Amino acid sequence: MAEKELAKVYEPTAVERKWYETWEQEGYFRANPDSGKPSYSIVIPPPNVTGALHMGHALNNTLQDILCRWKRMNGYEVLWMPGTDHAGIATQNVVERQLAGEGTSRHELGREAFIERVWKWKAESGGQIIGQLKRLGASCDWGRERFTMDEGLSRAVREVFVRLYEEGLIYRDNRLINWCPRCHTALSDIEVEHEDKAGNLWHIRYPVVGEPGRFVVVATTRPETMLGDTAVAVHPEDERYADLVGKKVLLPLVNREIPVVADGYVDREFGTGVVKITPAHDFNDFEVGRRHNLDLLNVFDESAVVNSAGHQYEGMERFAARKRVVEDLEALGLLEKIDDHAHAVGGCYRCKTVVEPYLSLQWYVKVGPLAERALAAVKDGRTRIVPQQWENTYYDWMENIKDWCISRQIWWGHRIPAWYCDHCGETTVAKIDPTVCAACGSDEIRQETDVLDTWFSSALWPFSTMGWPDRTPELAAFYPTSCLVTGFDILFFWVARMMMMGLHFMNEVPFSDVYIHALVRDAQGQKMSKSKGNVIDPLVVIDQYGTDAFRFTLAAFAAQGRDIKLAEERIAGYRNFVNKIWNASRFALMNLEGFEPDTVDPATLDLSNADRWILHRLNSAAAETAEALEAYRFNDAAGTLYRFTWSEFCDWYIELAKDDLYRGDDARKETARYVLWLVLENLLRLLHPFMPFITEEIWQTLPGARPAPSIMVAGYPRSVPERDFPDGAAEMELVMEVIRGIRNIRGEMDVAPSREIAAILSCGSAESLHLLKRNEVYVMSLARLSDLAIGQQLERPADAAIQVAGDVEIAVPLKGLVNVEEEEKRLLKEIGKLDKEIEMFGRKLENPSFVERAPADVVAKEREKLAEVTQKKDVLLASLEKIRKLA
C-alpha cells in the first residue's frame, strides 16, 4: 500500500529541500573507488569562487547532473567531482573594493596581510555558488569538493611547474603581452573582451630621408604609439613603393630615422598601403620586428603613461598624448587627413580598461611539443568532441598555437616557484622553498613576485583533484574521466590545455568525450547582459516554477549546436508538465489503493490492446531515451519523455484504462491496475535524471516493495522483450487515429466536446473492420459517441463531415448538430480577421526598406507569422466549404 497520499497541489520548495537533504545524508552522491563497479566520472568546470549561479552555469550543471544520475541508475560508480576556481584577478578585485571602502589598499596592507584577507573573504563569503548548485539538484560528491588553491592542488601546481621547467618547456622572455594598465597585470586572450567602437584613422606624413619634399603617408588608429616606431613597412609586391625599400624615413615629432622594410603582412588595400611598425606596442608589429631584427622601443609605463622614450610627451596619459600628438602633427603640416573608422578595441574583462599590448618580461610555456600530442588524441579518436563541428575549431587552434604566457602581476594566486640570486644572478626553481641559491649557495635570494595564470591550475583539474602526484585509488578508478561538459568559449583556453597537461603528466587523455553545449540567450536570441536588462536569474526561476520545471526546460531546448532562446513562458509551460505528472500520479494512486503489485504474476495477466500498446510504447521510450543520452541529444531524450508522459500515458492510456478500472470485472480491473502501476513506476525512473525531486516524491508513495531505498539508486528502465507488442501497438495506433479524426470534426464544426454524436466507420479492408470491432468500446468512450456503425462500403450520409484514418473513412452526420447559417457567419468573421492580418504581414514583407534593414531573424519571424495565419485561413476555408455543402 502507498505510504502516504500526495497533496492536492505540488509544492516544489519543501519537497526539494527534503529530498536533497536526504540524498546527502544517505551518501547517495558519494563515489567509492573500491566498489568494483564500472566507473563513470565527470569533473565540474570549476566556477569562480566569486561567482553566483547564472544561466550558463544552470545549463552546464543540469546536463552534467542528468548524465551522472542516469549512469548511477545504470549501475555505474559515479564520481562527479565538484570545486571552485580561485579566479585570480576577479577575487583580488572584490577584496580590493572592500579595502577601498575601508579607506585602505592592498599596498598599504602588504602582500602577506592582503593574502590573509583574501582567505578570510573566501571563508566568509566565497563559494555561495556551491549552495546554489545544490538548489539546482546537483548530485556532486561534495565531500571531495576542491579549490584550485587548496593544499593538494597547490602541490600539484608546483610539481608541474618544476617538471616543465626542468624539461625546458617553461622559460622566461621579454615579449609582447596583453596588459591592463589599471590592474597592472598581464591578461590571457580570454580575459580581453573585444568590442567594436567608432574611432578614427589618422593619415600621417613621414618625410623620406634625402629626398626633400617627398613623403610616405602612413594610416594608423593609434597615433600616440608612433613615438615607438622603429620602421615603416610596405608589401614586397607593391610597385608604388618598390624604390623606397631599404631607404629611411624621418619619424615625425621625435626626428629619428627609421628604415622602410618590405613584409607580406602589409595589406596593400588598407589605408595607403604603408604601415608604421611599432614592435613594442602591437602584436603583428612585434612579429614583423622579429623578422627584420628591429629595435623594441617601449614608450609607456605600467599605467600606460608615456615614459622618457616619448621625449616631450613624457608623463602624459596615453589618450591625452594621442590628442597632443595629433595637434602637433597638424601644426607641422604632417597630418594629411582623418577618416572615421570603426574597429575592435580590447578591454580588461574585470575593469573594462582598454588593454595595452605591452613589452614585458614574463614566464611562458613552450606549448608546441605538448600541442602535438593533444592534437593527435582527438584526430585518432581517443577523445571525441561533440558536436563534431567543434573538432575543426580545435584543430585550427592547436595547429596555430603560440607559447602561453603564464605569469600574472597580481598577488592572489599560485606564486611562481622561482627564486633569483642577487649574488650570481642565477634562477632557482624548486618544489620546496630553497634557503640558498642552487648555483652559488648564497642566501641572497628572493622569490618571483608574479603568480601563475588561473588557467594553469585549471589545466591540471582532472588529475590534481584526484590526488596527483600521488598514486591514489581515485586516479586508478576514475581517470581518464568519462566526459567533460563545457561551453565553446573555453574550448581552447581550458579544454585544450587540460588535454596537453593530461597527456604529458598522466600519459592519457583527461576525458573520453567533450560535450560542447550552446549559449542560453533571451527569447529574441540576444545574449543576456545586465546592461540590456534581459538577464533571467535561475534562482528567481527556481523559486517561481520549481527546479524540475526549470531543469526540464533547459534539457528540452539543449539541441546540439543551437543556442537556447529562453523565455519564462517556456518554463511556465514545463511547470504545467510537472503538474500534469503530479495529477496523473494522484489519479493512479487513488485507483491503486489496496493494490499489492508484488502478489501479481505478470505472466498470468490477460492484457487488453490498450495495455499492450502502452507497454510497447514504454519499451520504445526507454530505448529512445537511452539512445539519445548516449549521443548527448538531451533535447531528443526530453522530447521522447515529454510525449510519452503527456500524450501517450496521461492523455491516452489513462483514458483508455478507465473503462476497465471503473466497469471491468475483477480480473480486468487487476490487470489495468498492474499496468497502470508498472508504467507509472517505470516512467518516474525514466524521468528522474531530468526531474529528480518530483519523481522521488511520487515514487516513494507507490505501493509495493521498493527495489532500492531511493529512486536515485534504483535501476534505469530498459527495453525488455516481454513488453514488446508491435502488432498490438499498430492496432491501437489506428484506433487512436480514428478517435482523433472524430475529434477533429468536432473541432472544425464547433461541436461541444460534451455533446454526444454518431459516427460511421467505413473500412477499406476486412482487417481494419475486425480491428475496429475489437476496439469498439474505446472508440465509443473516447470519441463520446451515442451511436457507432462499423462496416465496409457503408453509405455516407449527405449531411456528414468526412475524415480519413488509414483505409477507414470517418463520417459524422451533422444534421441537428450545427446551425449552418450561424456557423457560416462565424467562419466568415474569422476568415475576415485573418485576411487583415495577411494583408498587414504582406505589406511589411513587400517593403524593401524593412526586408533589407531589419535583422534577418526579425524578417524570418514575420515570414513565419504570415505562413501561420495563411495556414489557419486555409483550414477555415475548408470548414466553410463543408458547412456550405450541408445547406
From Swiss-Prot:
> Chief subcellular site?
cytoplasm
| Extent of motif 'KMSKS' region | 527-531
- Enzyme type, top EC level: ligase
**Which CDD domains does the UniProt record give?**
Anticodon_Ia_Val (cd07962), ValRS_core (cd00817)
Please give the coiled-coil regions recorded for this protein: 817-885
- Any one GO cellular component localisation term in the record: cytosol
Q: Where does ATP bind?
A: 530
Q: Which reactions appear under catalytic activity for this entry?
A: tRNA(Val) + L-valine + ATP = L-valyl-tRNA(Val) + AMP + diphosphate
Task: Name the source's superkingdom.
Answer: Bacteria
Q: What is the protein's known function?
A: Catalyzes the attachment of valine to tRNA(Val). As ValRS can inadvertently accommodate and process structurally similar amino acids such as threonine, to avoid such errors, it has a 'posttransfer' editing activity that hydrolyzes mischarged Thr-tRNA(Val) in a tRNA-dependent manner.
Which PANTHER family does this one have? VALINE--TRNA LIGASE, CHLOROPLASTIC_MITOCHONDRIAL 2, VALYL-TRNA SYNTHETASES
Name of the protein:
Valine--tRNA ligase
| Organism encoding this protein | Geobacter sulfurreducens (strain ATCC 51573 / DSM 12127 / PCA)
Please name the taxonomic classification of the source: Bacteria, Pseudomonadati, Thermodesulfobacteriota, Desulfuromonadia, Geobacterales
The record's gene field reads valS
